[in-house]
Amino acid sequence: MQKFPLKKGLSSAQELHDEINNYIDVLMGHINPPIADGVDTLFEVSSTYLARAKEIEIKLLERERNAKVESGDELKKFRTGELRSFIELCKSAQNQGSRRITVALSELNLKEN
């Protein structure tokens, strides 16, 4: 269960490109995230975006398995290009968010002792 809703399913390569670009703008700090969850924000947002990216990837792989898809197909190029890079960005942001939480918990433990 995610803390905020996202689009679901597949659309055109251009619409998926626009969706992913919006998420990239959030992760890069160009626009505000959809939630403000303190130190957990980066982790929660990147985890949600990663889940959406993997959903898109799964749907695209199902499409390729069920139909003959040419190598020049726009959705296939999206999956092997932008989507793959976005998944890596989400994983990096998720790791950074996890480290921020760890540091915050360590600081809290030091204050309590």
PLM regions: where:
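Extended, charged interaction scaffolds in large complex subunits
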Residues: 1-113
